[in-house]
């Protein structure tokens, strides 16, 4: 790959030697297979720790009565950012308190939803089904 045409700054920001920085966060399994698990731009920076929204969403989906969820980072005066969850319930029994109680022993303290929990009827999504996090940030 030769780079961006007439845009040296984009080349400096996007390339490291012959490697292109995609912004993807990946893991490698014991067989050497690579899996994309998140995006760097979506990572939440809490007190110097990188928190994966995907990891939090996976845990929240295990809570009884949760149909769908999205997590974003919101500004926090002491932590820099804090995770906030937007939850679509599958039953009327879901509450902010029930989700917090479910997560209390499952997540490290810095991964707790100190940015809050918002119960919604549906998440904003693109025509392809991708959560529109930008719209959630605007709420």
Residue ranges and their predicted role:
Residues 108-130:
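AMP-binding/adenylate-forming catalytic domain of the ANL superfamily
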Residues 2-3, 10-13, 17, 25-111, ...:
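AMP-binding/adenylate-forming catalytic core of the ANL superfamily
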């Amino acid at each position: 790959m030769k780079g961006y045409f007439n845009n040296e700054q984009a080349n400096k920001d996007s390339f490291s030697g012959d490697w292109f920085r995609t912004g993807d966060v990946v893991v490698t399994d014991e067989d050497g297979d690579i899996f994309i698990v998140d995006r760097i731009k979506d990572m939440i920076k809490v007190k110097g720790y990188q928190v994966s929204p995907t990891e939090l969403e996976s845990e929240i989906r295990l809570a009884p009565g949760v149909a769908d969820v999205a997590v974003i980072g919101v500004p926090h005066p002491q932590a820099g950012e804090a995770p906030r969850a937007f939850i679509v319930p599958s039953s009327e029994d879901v509450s902010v308190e029930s989700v917090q109680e479910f997560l209390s022993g499952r997540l490290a303290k810095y991964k707790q939803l100190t940015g809050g929990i918002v119960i919604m009827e549906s998440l904003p999504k693109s025509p392809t089904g991708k959560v529109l996090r930008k719209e959630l940030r605007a709420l």
